[in-house]
Amino acid sequence: MSRPQRQIVYFATAMSLVNLGDSLFYVIVPTYYTHLGLIPFQVGILLSVNRWVRLATNHLAEYGYRRYPSDLWLLGAFFTGAVVSTIYGLATTFFLFLLARIAWGIAYSFLRQAGVMHVVACSAENALTEQMGYFTGINALWRTSGLFLGGLCHDHFGFTMTFVGVGILSLLALPLNRIARKQAAMPDREARAVKESGRNGALVCFGIVMGLVGGGMIISTLGLVLKTRVGESFHLAGFLVGVATLTGFVMAVRHLIDGVGGPVLGALVDRIGWRRSTAGLFLLGSILLLMTGLQENVAGLVVVIMLYFICATALYTALYAQSGQNGPRSVAAFATAIDFGMSVGPLIGWGIAQLKLPLSTIFFTGSAVYAVGAVVAFKSLSRSSLPLSMGPR
């Protein structure tokens, strides 16, 4: 395995800082929404509206970077992310939360587009998936401690102080971004992306599946699921542990898996082949989600979810690396597919809660959707004579 490029390390760290407010929003709000004067369906809207916005702004970001190249796009996006985290802590109405989530959706389109293409610009083609694993992994490792400490701070210092503090901390992303940025032209990849722009059907399908289940239904309702199992708090080794702390711990372990597993899983995907890896991972993920819905105790549920997170990490790393290799337009298309799934996912998950259906229904539904992804992947594997835009290298 090769070492991560220095520019990738700096940029991933900056991304992790400005992403922390959004990550904590998913951890804290599902367990605290009644204190904010929100109802479950409003929570679903807030957890998904930033993704709906990105359906329009992903291609806008790609166009802006390509047509009017300037570092001001990225600086503005980082600054907006810091301001939004502060607004979370100060907002008192659903409307203010909604405006903040919309602003974050716009900013993240520019951050993600720049991040993926930054990795492509800094990586050799035969090590792209591995370097993408480093990018997502470093980002995740920096956020791991932040998520756990954020949940802990919320339980001890309150909602407002936690998010205002995160907003101030996020400003460190500005100097880190300046260190990381490096100009790199990729005319061959952009030309290839234009040539293959009409052959991304399976890529779009996989993006929707990943976004709908992992980033949408599971993550947005994890705090609620854990709360129904343990209540507001529980005792562990003589200590009183709040549900926000438990949720933050689970989310932190998820990012730890991303951090440790990203480069390793990326290297394995390169060795095994993209089609075979994708088919196997979607099938395994479907089985694990089914098992999660059948778990009766919290410990078993957490363990199986961790295994599912490993599958999701491998899929996320491989698919983003391949879309990046195809060029900026493919990145925007794949990102939009993921965002569409992530937009619908929280509405489905919290809609299930609103209808008072068993919360295990969330995992059973996710299992069925992953099974669809597996079918598409196996069909692609059997049609090797009709290669996708992201064939194995």
Residue ranges and their predicted role:
Residues 28-41, 220-244:
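Short amphipathic helix-loop junctions that connect adjacent transmembrane helices
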Residues 45-62, 249-264:
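Central cavity-lining transmembrane alpha-helices of secondary-active solute carriers
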Residues 57-69, 260-273, 353:
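Helix-to-loop junctions at the C-terminal end of transmembrane segments
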Residues 72-86, 167, 276-290:
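Structural signature of the two symmetry-related core transmembrane helices
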Residues 102-139:
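Cytoplasmic helix-loop-helix junction between adjacent transmembrane helices
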Residues 110-123, 313-327:
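Intracellular juxtamembrane helix-capping segments at the cytosolic ends
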Residues 167-186, 376-381:
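C-terminal membrane-cytosol helix-exit motif in multi-pass small-molecule transporters
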Residues 275-318:
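C-terminal transmembrane helical hairpin of 12-TM major facilitator-type secondary transporters
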